[in-house]
C-alpha cells in the first residue's frame, strides 16, 4: 500500500497511471476552492507546478480565456496524462506541458503572471530555495498560490508522512515564513476550517 501511495509524489508504472487519474477527480473540490483566490486577468500567462493529471491546467485555461497555461511535472507519466487531458488546448497553442524540476525552473526571469501549486509543495525539497525559483520567473506584481488539502494542524494527517517518503505537511504560518524569506510580499493565509484546507497566496514585489 505504501508503494502505491508513493505515486502521489512521483507517479510511475501502472500505479502511477491510476494515481494521476485519481488526482484529477480526487483533488477537484479543494482545487476549485483554491482557484477562488486567484487574480482575475483574462489574458494571464500561468504556470501550474506539479501539474499531475492536468485537470487544473484545464480549469486555469477556462479561468483565463485569453491566456496561456504551462504545466510542469517531474513525472513522465503525469506529463503524458496532462498532455492528453489538454490536447485540444495544446493544438490551439494555448497550453504546453513539460517535464522538469521545481528546483531549476526552465523559464526566463519575470515570465509568468500567475503560478499555482496544488497539492504538491509537500514533496518539494529545499522549500525556501525553490520558492526563490518561483519568485524569479514571476513578473513583478505577479502572484503565487499554494493550495493544500491539509492545513498542517490535524495530527491525524501526519500519518501520511510516515507512509509517503519525502512528504512534509506545512502549516500556513510555516509557508508564510518561508515565502517571506524567499522575497515574497503580501502573503495571506486562507483556510476552510471545516475541511482543514489551506491556501496561501503571495506576490512578487513591484519593480
Where are these regions (language model features)?
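A generic alpha-to-beta junction signature in SAM-dependent methyltransferases
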Residues: 38-40, 63-64, 89, 138
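A short glycine-rich, Lys/Arg-flanked "PGG" loop and its adjoining helix->strand segment in the class I
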Residues: 128-140
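A short SAM/SAH-binding and catalytic strip from SAM-dependent methyltransferases
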Residues: 114-126
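N-terminal, positively charged/glycine-rich alpha-helical extensions of SAM-dependent methyltransferases
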Residues: 1-15
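C-terminal alpha-helical "lid/dimerization" subdomain adjacent to the S-adenosyl-L-methionine
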Residues: 14-24, 143-201
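Class I SAM-dependent methyltransferase SAM/SAH-binding core
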Residues: 45-104
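A short acidic, Gly/Pro-enriched loop at the edge of an enzyme's catalytic core
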Residues: 103-114
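Conserved alpha-helix/loop element of class I SAM-dependent methyltransferases that forms part
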Residues: 25-44, 59
